[in-house]
Amino acid sequence: MTKAQFKSGLFAFMKYLPFGKAILKALYLRNFPSLQKNVLGLRFSNPIGVGSGLDKTGSFYDEIAAIGPSFVEIGPLRDVHTAIATLQAEPKDCVVFADLSNSGNIERGFSLIYDFVDAVVFNASSNTNVLATMDRIITLRRYNDVYKPIIIKLFPDLKDEQYKEAADYILRNGIDAVEVIPTKVGLMLELTHNLVPVISYGRFSSYEEVAQTLDDGAQLVALSYLPVKDGFHYINGLLQKLSKK
């Protein structure tokens, strides 16, 4: 069993444990009013979220939210139906992004889950042509009464000229936000002329790394990794330090 599977298993266990979510909230969920912010037309209780990879089915995002993140990125979803069933049955305790990059039919997955999440994420790497698909996704969004943000996540295997191409596409087509690794935050802000919110994602192992990427201009931080040694307290510890900055 990998560390990621172990952590996912812990949250799944807390979902089915009687009062599991309530226990997590009582132990780890704290309010930091000074960290609240509005991004993408959405209200975030703080800038820290959990990126895709931990809740790959959209089954226990509320249990993850109970330890402090303001948003959870579910997926990459292979099948949106499990996530939709959970989203229909349980009120969301946080902002929920859906990563549809592993969905067999991205356009169908987008249409099905659109009404149930707060934003949708698509991955762009050197071996995918996601921007071609995005034209159809943007068209589909126009048929919905409620506007939901679309986020493009740029993988680190892209070359700088591909970041430039992506930035041009984002500006030209009204993509709402972009996710990049910490070392590309400054580049993307420059390429988009500070017109598009940047979300920094990756394995942040310390408060200093999180604080630095926020200082570099990231609006939000999506943690791709929760250190096992710090347990459920990790995010709360980050928020306590950020609130004192």
Question: What name fits each language-model region?
Answer:
Residues 1-104, 238:
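N-terminal capping/small domains of soluble enzymes
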Residues 47-50, 71-73, 93-99, 118-121, ...:
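Structural preference for beta-strand elements that scaffold enzyme active sites
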Residues 52-55, 99-102, 154-160, 197-208:
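Glycine-rich beta-to-alpha transition loops that act as phosphate-gripper elements at the mouths
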Residues 59-64, 108, 158-172, 190-195, ...:
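Catalytic cores of alpha/beta
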Residues 64-67, 84-93, 109-117, 137-145, ...:
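Acidic (Asp/Glu)-rich catalytic clusters
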Residues 72-79, 120, 124-126, 177-183, ...:
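Glycine-rich phosphate-binding active-site loops on the catalytic face of alpha/beta enzymes
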Residues 80-94, 132-152, 156, 184-200, ...:
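Alpha-helix-loop-beta-strand connector modules within alpha/beta enzyme cores
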Residues 100-107, 129-133, 149-171:
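Active-site glycine- and acidic-residue-rich loops that bind
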